[in-house]
Regions:
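Short, polar/acidic, helix-capping and beta-turn segments at strand->helix junctions
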Residues: 2-11, 15, 20-152
Length: 152
């Protein structure tokens, strides 16, 4: 008795199914927020936007954000610049870096045609976890209402 071999359906890879059903766009933003190396600042696949990591470096100026002096004066006052040297030197770097990174995220998200309320997840890296409350204070200025999920 001869048996007929089973026909297995052709396996579809994630790449092949995504490319058939979802439009994919790669973006490098305007100079004020362009990446430091050759990579996409974000990638849009269907309704999803995936951002590359953003650090506290201003590529346009070639400047590492180190304190209140490296961000607009209005932003520095808004996030907690006191004018008191010892206090500003202690908390200024993390507040200014947090503001700069979140502003770059906002610019990138808006460049992609979305808004901060569309952000569903953030991943933050800290050298010193004691800085998280200061970062969180700045983050609350950029996100209102439902907060994105977060990994620290």
């Amino acid at each position: 008795m001869a048996t007929t071999p089973l026909k297995t359906p052709k396996r579809q890879t994630a790449k092949s199914s995504a490319s058939k059903s979802l439009a994919s766009k790669t973006h490098t933003p305007k100079p004020q927020a362009s990446p430091l190396a050759r990579y996409s600042a974000y990638r849009q696949v269907g309704d999803f936007i995936f951002l590359s990591g953003i650090i506290a470096v201003n590529p346009k100026e070639g400047l590492i954000i180190q304190g209140f002096a490296d961000i607009p004066q209005e932003a520095a006052r808004l996030i907690g610049q006191t004018g008191e040297f010892s206090s500003d030197m202690k908390i200024g770097p993390i507040l200014a870096q947090s503001w700069f990174v979140l502003e770059q995220i906002q610019k990138t998200v808006e460049d992609a045609g979305a808004q901060m309320s569309d952000v569903v997840k953030l991943v933050q890296y800290f050298k010193n976890l004691d800085h998280f409350p200061l970062y969180s204070r700045v983050r609350n200025l950029f996100f209102t209402g439902v907060m994105p999920t977060s990994t620290v």
